[in-house]
Regions:
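Weak global preference for isoleucine
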Residues: 3-5, 15, 25, 56, ...
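Mid/C-terminal beta-alpha module of Rossmann-like enzyme folds, strongest
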Residues: 39-110, 116-139, 147-169
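Alpha-helical substrate-binding/gating segment
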Residues: 7-15, 24-54, 59-61
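A short C-terminal helix-loop "cap" of Rossmann-like NAD(P)-dependent dehydrogenase/epimerase domains
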Residues: 1-21, 79-83
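Short coil/turn segments at secondary-structure junctions
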Residues: 20-24, 91
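Short linear motifs at secondary-structure transitions and domain/linker junctions
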Residues: 2-4, 29-33, 74-77
Length: 169
């Protein structure tokens, strides 16, 4: 699980390749996460809530596979098709920590924090994009983004999967 923020381009990091494309993702938006924290501070929270572990997730409306999240995000950013921008071997094939959490509904039962899903999140991403980025993404060919932005991120950064393979790490 992860907290989804509207400034998606600030997350351009090699970790985007650490996840297998078929990984199940359940996120929680920044607003819903903030509401969760605020609601946890209320006097009305029952005593049995405390001293337990919970998985924070946005529920069914915030569940999708990583490949779906990547493609829908690239669409909103105006970047194009995932297969035109990346290579399959840039992505890990196993062992990442995201899942769908059945018990995140227990937390929702206590704190009533959920109000947003994938569609609302992607609307926030689009609204947060500066005009120059919206225009730039639409006029820049996918091969340029792949070659000068995403490939270096996948291959040249010490935290990237392909760097590890290329440098026997």
């Amino acid at each position: 699980t992860f907290i989804a923020i509207a400034d998606l381009t600030s997350l351009m990091d090699p970790i985007m390749f650490h996840q297998p494309l078929d990984t199940c993702i359940e996120f929680c938006t920044m607003e819903d996460s903030g509401r969760l924290l605020a609601n946890a501070c209320e006097d009305s929270v029952p005593e049995e809530f405390w001293r337990r572990f919970y998985n924070i997730g946005g529920g069914e409306r915030c569940r999708l596979n990583y490949i779906e999240l990547q493609q829908r995000s690239f669409d909103v950013l105006g970047m194009g098709k995932l297969e035109d921008l990346t290579e399959r071997n840039w992505f890990a094939t196993r062992n990442f920590h995201c899942h769908w959490f059945e018990d995140s509904d227990v937390l929702e039962g206590y704190l009533r924090f959920r109000s947003q899903g994938v569609d609302e999140y992607l609307q926030q991403v689009q609204a947060a994009l500066p005009a120059w980025q919206r225009i730039g993404a639409r006029v820049t060919p996918a091969w340029l983004v792949k070659r000068f932005v995403l490939r270096p991120l996948a291959r040249n950064h010490p935290d990237s999967t392909m760097y590890w393979l290329d440098h026997d790490r």
